[in-house]
């Protein structure tokens, strides 16, 4: 066994089941009643409970957040050859469903919020309007739980009469001006992947106040099967429904969401208190309008003395997990030929954040001793 393997592993963000065993109780109920299927009481209840929690009229539980984005795009009519304006600084799962629909992504740079820049979004609309084109949808992301500047973005979308889809995969529990992110746009998306603030092991949820769109998404997610005795399909469907077992985990996790948010915020505040005095190190930006869930605590460096890779390697040597900021979509080889809109004459805001940023371990099972170890390793690089 190596020295590194003997050290306690500190994770970036791993699954955290409730101490009360809520998840296990719902799973055992599913086994006892033989609801081992991609439908059932847990699925129905999870949809209702999540909708009530975030304050929307309807929700559909799906196999992933990616599936939810896909069906959101389909629900607003995105199809072959359509243009979709998409936040550049994000994980690829935000953009990939655009291609599933045969549509064309145009990537929009970030601003000081780390999220989509409204001025750049406006520039994109003006550019494509001059070419006689208009996007079929806009996808905004609430990166790492930080709310995007929704008022400004929604105003632009209303001006051009284009639907807004919120990728709130990372921001369940984040509030924009007191209201849950993911509930402002035409449709919102949440993810319950294993590293998210609550998990179903894998899964997602599509939410909206447009009950017809959610009804249609549920139909597509169930192989677009018609409500007749025999198997009939008038539309292309998908196998996207969430398992009743996974939904049981989600129901249990939802009961400890407030605890998880509180711990994530505690971790962020701990890092802020113990690292902010280091020259050239800043915590991720929180705006006045924002009450983030702090899913991941991120930093950005403005010093030549220490690079993000130095911190990653130093933490790795102590068996501590960290990772770079998402690599922007316009820098991804698959998307290199797509249009990218920025206000910068050279480079971009998203690329700068990627080059200088870093995600610190933000696991809700971390102890104060773990946090002290992380900060000690980082401070050691400053000498």
Protein language model annotation of sequence segments:
Residues 2-3, 41-48, 56-59, 119, ...:
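PLP-dependent aminotransferase class I/II
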Residues 101, 159-160, 318:
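Helix C-cap/helix->beta junction micro-motif
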Residues 113-200, 205-207, 212, 307:
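Active-site phosphate-binding strand-loop segment of PLP-dependent enzymes
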């Amino acid at each position: 066994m190596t020295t590194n393997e003997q050290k306690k592993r500190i994770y970036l963000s791993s699954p955290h089941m409730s101490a009360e065993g809520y998840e296990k109780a719902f799973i055992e109920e599913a086994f006892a009643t033989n609801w081992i299927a991609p439908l059932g009481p847990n699925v129905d209840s999870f949809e209702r409970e999540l909708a009530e929690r975030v304050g929307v009229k309807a929700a559909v539980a799906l196999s992933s957040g990616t599936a939810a984005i896909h069906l959101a795009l389909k629900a607003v009519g995105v199809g072959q050859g359509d243009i979709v304006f998409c936040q550049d600084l994000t994980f690829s799962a935000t953009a990939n469903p655009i291609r599933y629909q045969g549509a064309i992504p145009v990537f929009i740079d970030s601003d000081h919020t780390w999220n989509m820049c409204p001025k750049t979004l406006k520039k994109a609309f003006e550019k494509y309007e001059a070419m006689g084109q208009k996007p079929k949808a806009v996808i905004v992301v609430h990166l790492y739980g930080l709310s995007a500047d929704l008022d400004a973005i929604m105003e632009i979308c209303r001006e051009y009469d284009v639907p807004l889809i919120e990728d709130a995969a990372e921001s369940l529990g984040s509030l924009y001006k007191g209201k849950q992110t993911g509930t402002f746009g035409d449709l919102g998306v949440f993810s319950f992947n294993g590293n998210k603030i609550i998990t179903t092991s894998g899964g997602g949820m599509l939410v909206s106040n447009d009950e017809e769109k959610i009804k249609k998404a549920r139909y597509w997610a169930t192989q677009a099967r018609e409500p007749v005795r025999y198997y009939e399909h008038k539309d292309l469907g998908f196998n996207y429904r969430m398992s009743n077992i996974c939904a049981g985990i989600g129901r249990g996790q939802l009961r400890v969401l407030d605890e998880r948010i509180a711990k994530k915020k505690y971790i962020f505040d701990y890092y802020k208190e113990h690292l902010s005095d280091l020259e050239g190190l800043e915590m991720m930006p929180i705006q006045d309008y924002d009450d983030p869930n702090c899913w991941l605590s991120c930093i950005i460096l403005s010093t030549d003395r220490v690079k993000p890779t130095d911190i990653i390697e130093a933490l790795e040597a102590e068996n501590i997990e960290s990772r770079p900021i998402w690599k922007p979509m316009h820098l991804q080889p698959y998307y290199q030929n797509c249009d990218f809109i920025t206000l910068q004459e050279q480079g971009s805001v998203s690329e700068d954040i990627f080059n200088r940023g870093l995600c610190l371990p933000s696991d809700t099972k971390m102890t104060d001793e773990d946090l002290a170890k992380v900060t000690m390793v980082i401070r050691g690089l400053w000498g």
